[in-house]
Structure formats: structure tokens, C-alpha cells
Amino acid sequence: VLDKMQEEMANGYFERLIQTTLLDNTHAAVITLAPEPGLGDRKDEALKEELATYKASLSDEEVAALVEQTQQLLERQTTPDKEEDLAKLPKLSIEDIDREVKPLPLTVEASEGKPTFLHYEDFTAGISYVKYYFDLSGVKTEDIPVVAFLTEVLGEVGTANFTDEALSTEIDFYTGGIGTNATVITESVADNLYYPKFTVSGKALSEYQPQLLSLIEEVVHRSNLDDVEKIKELLLNVKADLEMNFNYGSHVAALRRLESYYYEGAKYLQSLEGIDYYDFICDVVAGFDEDPQAFIDRLKAVLETILTTDQLVATFVGSKEDFDHFKQVSEDFFKHLGNHKVEKQAFTNPVEVLNEGFKTAQEINYVAKGYNQTLLGVPVNGMNLFLKSVLGLDYLWNTVRVQGGAYGGMSVITDKGDVAGLSYRDPNIVETLERYDGQVEYLENFNLSEAEFEKNLIGTFSTIDRPLSAAQKGAVAFTRYFTHLTQEKVQQFRDEILAVTPEKVRAYAPTMKAIMDQNAFVVIGNDTKIENHKDIFKNIRNLTK
């Protein structure tokens, strides 16, 4: 069969196959899924009536039997597993954990008035990983979401020398991909130290470095931003993608919104990828047809502001020989960039605890509550990551997921001091917020068995010591460079994790209480349930437009 297909391929076999079986096939169905506002609520009411009717048909003995079954289930949910059963599970011992942090050595080459080069040397099988970090400090607050949209445009539109299809083919032929992104690198929440960056990255076999950088230059310098129809298409696609991401990742949207209540860097990030960015895209879509050129001119002006060699950092993962070649090839790329100084702009969107409820047509909720401990004067300690493990896998798992019926209950605790509870596909709102507050009592009475304590301590290292590729190690090393994180500090953090004791965990309870007492929370979820609890919110709105 394969030989026959090979022979017929040159004679239009696949073209005829597509024409016959797909394009000219009359056996097809078009199915439309149309949302109906209020349908979920009506179904809920119908179910309540059905259950009430069913209950009325039962005898007292049958009702009592159902109550007894429910009580047995609740008891099972709240009863810890037996020690002898847990002991049957295979496990590591704390002695299996490495005490020393493996270094990630970085070569830094900096010269006054020139871009800085960073090199993480590792075996990459002849692949060069490159990334350019452009400083976004010179972008005005109102133009920050324009930067985010530029990352959606560059690489998707045609250029001076290629159509969009030809550009995609050229990139696929010579490289492993070229991408642009905008992000915020955080050093300290308490000190409000963060670094917004626009990045252009790519990877290619080392012999194709010149083609890789030539294509990067083509994308950032020669993209056709005057294609009105393509820009409009991308705007609509971005709006649809954001709405889809909200639908499947509302817990992430809720967490990022919560962080923006107390940290300027997170507020900045809202304009790059969060709800603020979505609102911006909606506004642009609504007014685009009236004056498309005004928005296109704005895209061009912001891109020109970004593309300068001032404060530029070029990173590379690969061999020393390939790094030297990368530096040479980069010089040609730098010649096409501006050399204007980055004039730092003040960020004018103030942080504020808004306690928002975002209404959706979903039947479930995503509930986030928390704050940053460094803003309360409590420095970050390695124990924070242990707390994430024990709170997420023990307390929140049992209370929010098992007892509360949520699909997920998570503890989000970062090395920057963020501490939050987060639920996923949760039938509750107020009950979940109360369970987050219950973390205080859990910590006050923290008393795991020695085996359970050690299991959670070992589990803490599952994220810290996960295997990393050469490119991922390089990314970690580059982030440490930007945030001035030393090897000594990383080692100290690890030592603090290994030094955790139950007494130290219990001593954290007052900090958790102070965090929960800030009463900062976000809910994305069912419109009726949010309205039923409207008194707890400062602001309520529909999530999407």
C-alpha cells in the first residue's frame, strides 16, 4: 500500500483524496452550540424540584438511611488514613536529599554603552538557544497592553521580504521557532523591584545562527504592521483566545488578579496578559473600524520605543565556540536597532484591594485569597515552600476538595512571599473563603506524625529538584542574574527548608492570620452565586464582554 501511495503521490493522489472525501463529500453535518443565558440556573431549579419530589416519596426510614450514608461519607472524608496503611507506600528518606545546591555558572560580558551578553554553557547537541531582553521601562502606562499585542502580531504578519506563509516556512526550515513575549521579572515585592521585559527568542542548529538572527531581524524590523485586515483578524483572535483561556484557566486569572491588588509588578502584568489586557483588546476591537490607522501608528511607535540597544541583554545557551559566533552575528542585528536611551516612565496604575467578583456562565467558581508576607514585615524563608506542600496536599486538599467538593484546592506560596489559597471548579464561595481562614488554626495545631512530616518535607523538593534541560537551566541562571540572586542565597533557602521543624510551622500561624486578615480575595464564577453573596464584594462585573 505504501509503495502504491508513493507512486501515485506525484500524480495528484492526495489532492484527489482530499477533494473526494472532504471537499465534495455531501455526508456532512454542521452543528452549532449556542449559549442560552440562565439555562444553568433553570436546570438547577429543576433538579431541586426533582430531588424534593423524590424526597417526598421516601419513607422516614429511607430518608434516615440516606442521612446515615451521608454521615458515613463525611466521617470517611475527615478521617486520616491509618499509619499502618501509609507505611505500606514506598518512599524516600530525608537522607536521600542532596544538601548542596548545584551551581549554574554564568558568564557575563558587559561593556559601557553596549548590550550585555550572558552565556550559560552546557551540552545542547549543537543547538543554539538565544534570547534578547529589551527593557520596557520606557513604555508609558497606557501603552503597556500595546506591547502585549505586538507579541501576538510579530511573526504572524508578512514582512517586507516574505508573505506570512512564506515567513512561517522560512522559520520552520532554518530554526526550531522564533517567538516574542512580554513579561515582568520580580526581584522584591516589599521593595517594589521588578523589571518589565520584551523578549525575542529563537533556537536553531549552530550552523544556522546567521539565518536565525536574520529572521529575527526580519520579524522585529520589517513586519507589515499596515495590513489592516490582518491586524483586525489578530485582534479578534486574541480576544477569543483570552476568553477561552478564562474559561479553562480561571483559577490562574483569579490568582494573577489577586496579586495585582498589592504588588505593582503584578499590576503591570495585568496589562500584559490579565483581565486589564482583555479589557484593552475589547476596547480596541470596538473602535478599530472607525480609525484603524491610529492604532497601527501606535503599534509602530511603541515598537520603535522598545527596539534600542540601551539596556539590552542578549542571552545564549550552548557551547563556548557557538557563543563566540553568536556574539559576532549579533553585531549585525544590533546595527539595525536604535540607540536611544531608555527614559524610565512612571507606572500610573495604583494597586488597590478591590475584592472583585467576576460573573461567568459557568456553574462553578474559582476562589483566590491571600497577600504577600514581606509587605507585612515578614521576610521569606525556605520554610515557605514546605508550607506550600503541607497546606496544599494536606489541609486544602481535604477541606476544599474532599469536603468542599471542589475539583482542586491549592496552596500558592512563592519565594517572593506571596501566600494564597486557590480553588478550581469549586461549587462554593463563602465556605471556601472560610476554609482559607482555617489555615491559621491548622498551623496552630500542626502535629503531623514523624513519617508524614518527613514525607511532606521530601515532597517540597519535588519542584526544586526537578530535572531541567540545558535551556531550562539557562533560563533559571538568567533570571537569577536579573534578580541579583546569589548562589549563597539559594543555598541558604535550601538549608532553611531542611531545617524546618513542627515548632517553626506552628510559629508561622500569626503570619498566616495577618495575611488572611488583609481580606484580599477574587472570585471568578457563577453569576447567580456571586450575586447571592454580593455583600462580600466591593466590585462585581461580568468577566467577558
Which stretches of residues belong to each language-model region?
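In a subset of proteins, long, contiguous C-terminal domains/tails are tracked
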Residues: 166, 499-545
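Short amphipathic alpha-helices in soluble, non-transmembrane regions
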Residues: 214-216, 327-333, 435-437, 536-537
